A protein has these predicted regions:
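Hydrophobic helical h-region of N-terminal Sec-dependent signal peptides
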Residues: 11-14
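C-terminal motif of bacterial Sec signal peptides marking the signal peptidase cleavage site
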Residues: 19-21
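Bacterial N-terminal signal peptides that target proteins for export
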Residues: 1-9
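Extracytosolic ligand-binding ectodomains
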Residues: 2, 23-434
Length: 434
C-alpha cells in the first residue's frame, strides 16, 4: 500500500478505519511495531494491578490499537503517538510524581476477538485508561467491558455517532469528531460540486451506517436527491448487484464509504463505466485512505475525491518529525496527533483529579479541554495544574473544547483529490465544521 499519501493524510485525516509496542515503566518507552504477540508490556516491578486500575500508585495506560485487521495501516502512527505522549509526560515529571506506564495491545477487527482478549489482559494488569480502538465497530464490542470495570476508554479515531449517546457511565471519550460533522462536510462538498443526485454504497456497521446516514440527511436538506442507498455486509467481496443498481441509477455522484474493500468496489465501478475517470463524480471518506495502494491499477482513481477529519500537519512540524523518527517516514501518520492528545488529556485529568481511578479521571477530562488557562503541552499544563489553575489544553489537534458527551465540539476536515496515474491525493482545502 502506498504510504506517501497516508503520510500527508496522517494527521490530516481528519474518517475512518498493535504491533505490540513494548516499553518499560519509567521514561523508557519503546514502540517496536514489529511484534505480533499482542504487545504485552509491564512495569519493571511486575505489578499486576487490580482489574479496573485505580490503585493510586501510578497511572497505567493500556492501548488497543490496530496492528492487525482492516485498519492495521493506522497502527504505527497511533502506537507511536501514544509512546511519544508518555515520553513527554515522564520527561515533565510524570503523574503523581511517578512515571506513567503504557501497556500496548492490538485491537484486530470485528472478524476476531482480539480486542476482547486484549482488554481482559489490560484490565488484569491494572490499566486505569485504555486508548482505542481505532475502529468504531471494534470499540462497540468492548466498550461495556471496559467502562463496566470503572476504566476510561478513550479513542483517537472513533467517528460513529453512536458514541455520543451511548450509555458508557461517563467513561468514554474521543478526540476524533463525530461523523455527524463529516457527513455535513461531505454533503456540502458534493452539492457545491454541482451534483443534484447522488447514490451511496456503504459498509453495514457503526462507522459506515452512521456516516452514510449523516450524508443522506445533510444532502437531502441541501436540496439533493438520493437515488440509491446501498448497504453491504462487511465480509462482502463481490459487488455485482450493488454496481448494477448504481449503473441503473445514473446519479451525478457516487459516495463510497468503506475500508480496504473499497478497492473492489471502485474496480467494478470502473469496469462498468461509472468510476472516477468517467463522467460520474466519485467521492470517498477517511476509511478509504490508502486506496491507491490496494489497487492493481491505481490510475483508475484519477479524479476520486475524499473527505477526512484532519489535523493540519503544517502547524505541527516538530511533532511530525518526531513521529516519523519513531515509526519511519514511509508509515502513515493518520491519527498520530489525536492519539498523542488522548494520552495527554488523560494524564492531565488524572493530575487534576489527584487520582488514577477511572471515575475520578473521567470527571475532569472534559474540563481540561475547555474554560481555563490555555496551554499547549503537558509540561506547560502540569505547571499550571500544580499552581492550582484551571487549564484548557489546546493540543496538536487544536482546541478540542469537549462537549459534555466527551467529544470535540468542532473539527477541521481535509478535502483531497487523486491525480494522474493514481498518484497520492493532493490537498484541495481544509474545511472547519462545528
Amino acid at each position: 500500500m502506498s504510504k506517501k499519501m497516508l503520510k500527508l493524510l496522517g494527521m490530516l485525516m481528519a474518517i475512518v478505519m498493535v504491533a505490540a509496542a513494548c516499553g518499560s515503566s519509567g521514561s523508557d518507552v519503546a514502540s517496536d511495531g514489529g511484534d505480533d504477540d499482542g504487545g504485552e508490556e509491564t512495569s519493571d516491578d511486575g505489578d499486576d494491578g487490580a482489574a479496573g486500575g485505580g490503585d493510586g500508585d501510578e497511572l497505567v495506560i493500556g492501548t488497543i490499537l490496530p496492528v492487525t485487521g482492516d485498519l492495521a495501516f493506522l497502527g504505527p502512527a497511533e502506537i507511536g503517538g501514544s509512546n511519544l505522549a508518555v515520553e513527554d509526560i515522564n520527561a515533565a515529571g510524570g503523574v503523581f510524581g511517578t512515571d506513567v506506564v503504557i501497556l500496548q495491545g492490538d485491537s484486530g477487527d470485528t472478524t476476531t476477538d482480539t480486542a476482547s482478549v486484549e482488554v481482559d489482559r489490560l484490565l488484569a494488569e491494572g490499566s486505569d485508561a485504555i486508548i482505542g480502538a481505532a475502529s468504531s465497530a471494534v470499540s462497540l464490542t468492548v466498550i461495556e467491558r471496559i467502562t463496566s470495570a470503572g476504566v476510561i476508554q478513550f479513542s483517537p479515531a472513533n467517528t460513529s455517532p453512536d458514541f455520543t449517546t451511548f450509555d458508557d457511565n461517563g467513561l468514554y471519550f474521543r478526540t476524533a469528531p463525530s461523523d455527524l460533522l463529516q457527513g455535513r462536510v461531505l454533503a456540502n462538498q458534493v452539492i457545491d460540486e454541482g451534483n443534484a443526485t447522488a447514490s451511496v454504497i456503504f459498509r453495514q456497521e457503526s462507522y459506515g451506517t452512521g456516516l452514510a446516514d449523516a450524508f443522506q440527511e445533510n444532502f437531502e436538506a441541501a436540496g439533493g436527491t438520493i437515488d440509491e442507498f446501498l448497504a453491504y455486509a462487511v465480509d462482502t467481496d463481490t459487488f455485482d448487484a450493488e454496481i448494477d443498481a448504481l449503473v441503473e441509477a445514473g446519479s451525478d455522484a457516487i459516495v463510497v464509504i468503506g475500508f480496504a474493500e473499497s478497492a473492489n468496489i471502485v474496480t467494478a465501478m470502473n469496469e462498468r463505466g461509472i468510476g472516477p475517470t468517467s463522467d460520474t463524480n466519485v467521492w470517498g471518506v477517511d476509511g478509504n485512505a490508502g486506496l491507491n495502494g490496494e489497487l492493481e491499477d491505481p490510475s483508475i482513481l484519477e479524479g476520486f475525491r475524499q473527505t477526512a477529519p484532519s489535523v493540519d500537519t503544517g502547524d505541527i512540524p516538530e511533532f511530525i518529525d518526531r513521529l516519523q523518527a519513531e515509526i519511519g517516514e514511509d508509515e502513515a501518520i493518520i491519527f498520530g496527533a489525536e492519539t498523542y492528545d488522548a494520552v495527554i488529556i488523560t494524564a492531565l485529568a488524572a493530575a487534576v483529579a489527584g487520582s488514577d481511578g477511572g471515575e475520578a479521571i473521567a470527571a475532569e477530562v472534559n474540563d481540561v479541554t475547555r474554560g481555563g488557562t490555555v496551554c499547549t503541552s503537558f509540561a506547560e499544563c502540569i505547571e499550571l495544574v500544580n499552581a492550582g489553575e484551571d487549564i484548557d489544553y489546546d493540543g496538536l489537534g487544536g482546541p478540542y473544547e469537549f462537549v459534555d458527551a466527551g467529544e470535540p465540539a468542532a473539527a477541521s476536515f481535509q478535502i483531497s483529490t487523486y491525480g494522474v496515474d493514481g498518484a497520492d491525493p493532493e490537498l484541495d482545502v481544509f474545511v472547519f465544521a462545528s
